[in-house]
């Protein structure tokens, strides 16, 4: 149908896979027990939890004991950064990150600065890439952690983590990566990436909201974020969300199993989308690296554009998209990521993020390519 809704905001969240829901249902009904108990229903819940932990670990190339289940990516980022810094227990501990991180990382670093932690937010180039040489140059004797995302949530750029990890390892500094956007889309084996801590979130790969995980390499100095019971081997207090965790593991298995074929399909659709929009809309610009980016990510800037007006126009035509910016008080603030790329505030505020997913079709891409030039023209700001 020509008027069927088009969902192009998969970087924000993905629909729950029906097969994932099916895997979760027993743990919402018959296997409802608390996994810390000793009776039958509790044992069933514990078995589901253990199987999920083993499955996630195998997918990441990790040990089951290195997986901590959380409520999602933001908690995992907080736990990773605060846990390593607290374990360092050093006055003036130093954290290296980048200027384009998710706010779960940037705001955590900012919060730690209130307690004497020092942070270096490295710049990126005009395509959003971090220079490993700048990582090396930023290291101090007090550097306790390097936290650099695997793939950016706005522009999809994939960072050279293997090079960065070699630098971190040579200096004996733990490396954390926010892999919330990349897990399930591109390979994320922890040894290949060379990371010591990795954050992920189920709802980014067709799993349930409210379920995430943190990988912590054995031997990494780290303290838990919250205290209470002895769940997660004493590393994350609170009764586990068993149904959500089972769903996370099932969604990850399904995403990784189809990753190669789906990645190729999405790249072809994405490249067609990018080429069509750049050709049809004068002044349009692709944000991010042309090739080192997630398969389904396309982010554009349009000069002299009212970004909020464009999003509302798209919504009225049945297209769900995003600016990649924080919406506050009825206006769209310029993206901190695009400002870090050197875009001026007008271009940063006139951004459009289109993120494709498992159900995106070539027909939908054609419809957006036909629709967008008209809507961009209508959303242009009046010349002064």
Q: What is each residue range found by the language model?
A:
Residues 1-384:
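Pyridoxal 5′-phosphate
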């Amino acid at each position: 149908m020509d008027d069927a809704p088009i969902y192009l905001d998969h970087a924000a969240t993905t629909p729950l896979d029906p097969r994932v829901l099916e895997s979760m249902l027993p743990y919402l009904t018959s296997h409802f027990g608390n996994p810390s108990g000793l009776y039958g229903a509790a044992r069933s819940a514990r078995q589901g939890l253990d199987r999920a932990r083993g499955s996630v670990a195998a997918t990441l190339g990790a040990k089951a004991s290195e997986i901590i289940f959380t409520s999602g990516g933001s908690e995992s980022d907080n736990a990773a950064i605060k846990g390593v810094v607290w374990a360092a227990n050093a006055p003036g501990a130093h954290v290296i990150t980048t200027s384009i991180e998710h706010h779960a990382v940037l705001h955590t670093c900012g919060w730690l600065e209130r307690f004497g932690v020092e942070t270096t937010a490295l710049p990126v180039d005009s395509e959003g890439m971090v220079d490993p040489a700048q990582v090396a140059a930023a290291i101090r004797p007090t550097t306790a952690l390097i936290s650099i995302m695997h793939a950016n949530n706005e522009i999809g750029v994939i960072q050279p983590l293997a090079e960065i990890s070699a630098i971190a390892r040579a200096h004996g500094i733990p490396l954390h990566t926010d892999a919330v956007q990349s897990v399930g889309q591109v390979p994320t084996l922890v040894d290949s990436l060379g990371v010591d801590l990795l954050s992920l979130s189920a709802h980014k790969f067709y799993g349930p909201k409210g379920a995430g995980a943190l990988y912590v390499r054995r031997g990494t100095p780290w303290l838990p974020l919250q205290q209470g019971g002895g769940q997660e081997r004493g590393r994350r207090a609170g009764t586990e969300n068993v149904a959500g965790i089972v769903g996370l593991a099932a969604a990850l298995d399904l995403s990784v199993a189809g990753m190669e074929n789906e990645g190729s399909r999405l790249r072809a659709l994405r490249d067609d989308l990018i080429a069509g929009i750049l050709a049809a809309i004068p002044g349009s610009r692709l944000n991010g690296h042309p090739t080192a980016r997630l398969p389904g990510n396309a982010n554009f800037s349009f000069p002299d554009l009212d970004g909020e007006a464009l999003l509302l126009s798209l919504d009225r035509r049945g297209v769900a998209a995003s600016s990649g910016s924080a919406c506050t008080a009825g206006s769209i603030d310029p993206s901190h990521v695009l400002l870090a790329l050197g875009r001026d505030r007008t271009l940063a505020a006139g951004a459009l993020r289109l993120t494709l997913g498992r159900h995106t079709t070539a027909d939908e891409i054609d419809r957006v390519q036909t629709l967008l030039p008209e809507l961009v023209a209508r959303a242009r700001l009046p010349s002064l």
